Amino acid sequence: QDGKRIIGYRQALTLDHKPESMIVVGSGAIGSELAYFYNAMGTKVLLVEFMPTILPLEDEEVSKQVGRSFKKAGIDVMVKSSVESVESGEGLLKVNIKNKKGEIEIHEAEIVLSAVGIAPNVENIGLEELNIEMERGRVKVDDYYRTNVEGVYAIGDIVHGPALAHVASAEAICCVEHIAGVHTEPIDYTNIP
């Protein structure tokens, strides 16, 4: 990612212009939402997904319905496909995509948006100095977001679970209610929209 033409979701939320064309790599919640948004704004969108369906973590019925809606809206979708390389130079980016037949297709776009996952922001924020326990690159917490250090809590993309804004908001409410002594139930991550 260069932050200008090959971007992540954070840059996609703050672009200062509407791109004419965009290839979105990854069709999870964030990739699908941004593909839909930019398409609605008039950008020609190609959505590329490695898995056999878009929204691969959702129910098959949901995935199929969203796929039909995307097709009707004019969003091109390639499943069982992967981006092999991106060539930048003057003009449009050239994106080499291996399709489901194993053949390389070359597509061009003004912007390539990588939405294949969120890296937790755990570097240089003082976790080491506090001896916060980590687990697979994220802060280890209990059901109420307590860390192993008394009085230190963690929510959002630095803990395990979906790295989505509305999930972090729900985690914050659960955490703060617990701190305040209000009886609260832990979040059920199997029922997240």
Predicted segments with their positions:
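FAD-site-proximal beta/loop scaffold in flavoenzymes
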Residues: 2-18, 107-184
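Rossmann-like dinucleotide-binding cores of NAD(P)H-dependent redox enzymes
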Residues: 13-14, 19-23, 29-103, 163-169, ...
